[in-house]
Amino acid sequence: MSEALYIFYALPYICFAIFVIGTIYRVVDWARSAVPLKIPTTSAQQPSFKFVRRTWIDKIDSPSSKFWAFVRVLFVVFLFRDLFRNTRYYIEMGGKNVDTRWLWLFAILFHYSLLVIVIRHLRFFTNPVPDFVKTLEYLDGVLGVAIVPPLLMTGVIALVALAFLWGRRILLAKERSISIPSDHLILFFMAVILVSGLLMRYIIKADLSYVKMFALSVVTFQPPSPEVLANLHWLFLIHFTFVCITIAYIPFSKVMHFAGVWFSPTRNMPNDNRRKRHVNPWDPNPELPILVREGITVAGVTYKCKKLDWDTYYEMYKDQLDEIAEKNYTLKAEEF
């Protein structure tokens, strides 16, 4: 039986390898993708006359340089600024505007609580435990000092925030209609991880000494002893398995937005169309019109010209135009 448990020792290496390879593949694929158009999404105008004052908020909303575009991405990543500004993304029946700042609040609570939880778990992988981990754990449980063990707020906050985010996808008609199975799958994984972790800490107590020995064996690449494996709690094995599966699943899910946002042209491109010409990287010779270099192929015939005049257009689509004329087809006003 103990030999079969060694699968749990190999599991994190397999899942982490899938995560690294998958993440590198997605990042390289995004980095190599050409951006044929300049499409920064802005809510402020470009710089114009010097006497037109632009605040630092305007510079973030409409970045005119790569530096301010980078600052804008930082605000998006760490403060979820776009989500905070998305206050009226749809209107309910009756003309009532729907404020979505609750979505921003619970989203930022979930992500930062999860970050604190991950940092707190470093105590299982280090010996001795770093002081900053001890300090963070103390601050996290400062409101639950009267409870043994102290109630760590981030675990509860993360679970409540996850319940809101998942309930929103289930209960709201608009969100339910655009949600796909993979959206619910990753939320299910996170729910199992959080619930099993809270159960181990407060209700079904697991022997954390064996958990730490197992964790240290994983990070030091030294297989644990059969005694350590035999004494791992079944709930910990469930918790650990879902953590590994989630890590391996990240490159194939929407969770990759943590890396994809850095490559989003609507966010990382400066809004400087008036000052700099954006050359289409797919266009090998931008000085010549595409009609001269490559032409347009219609029905197997390629037409090349300096400009698309009426005679060339009629020659290209003569058959279709004749067919329309034969059927005496005319557009009605309501069809526009």
From Swiss-Prot:
Q: Transmembrane region positions? A: 4-24, 60-80, 102-122, 145-165, 184-204, 232-252
Membrane topology of this protein: Multi-pass membrane protein
| Entry GO CC | plasma membrane
Query: InterPro entries, from UniProt?
Result: DsrM (IPR047660), Heme-iron_electron_transfer (IPR051936), NarG-like_domain (IPR023234), NarG-like_sf (IPR036197)
Task: Give the chief site where it resides.
Answer: membrane
Keywords, A to Z, come to: Cell membrane, Electron transport, Membrane, Oxidoreductase, Transmembrane, Transmembrane helix, Transport
| Protein role | Has menaquinol-oxidizing activity. The HmeC and HmeD subunits may together mediate electron transfer from menaquinol to an unidentified electron acceptor on the cytoplasmic side of the membrane.
PANTHER family linked: NITRATE REDUCTASE PRIVATE CHAPERONE, REDOX ENZYME MATURATION PROTEIN REMP FAMILY, RESPIRATORY NITRATE REDUCTASE 1 GAMMA CHAIN
Name of the protein described by the UniProt record: Hdr-like menaquinol oxidoreductase cytochrome b-like subunit
Q: Which organism is it from?
A: Archaeoglobus profundus (strain DSM 5631 / JCM 9629 / NBRC 100127 / Av18)
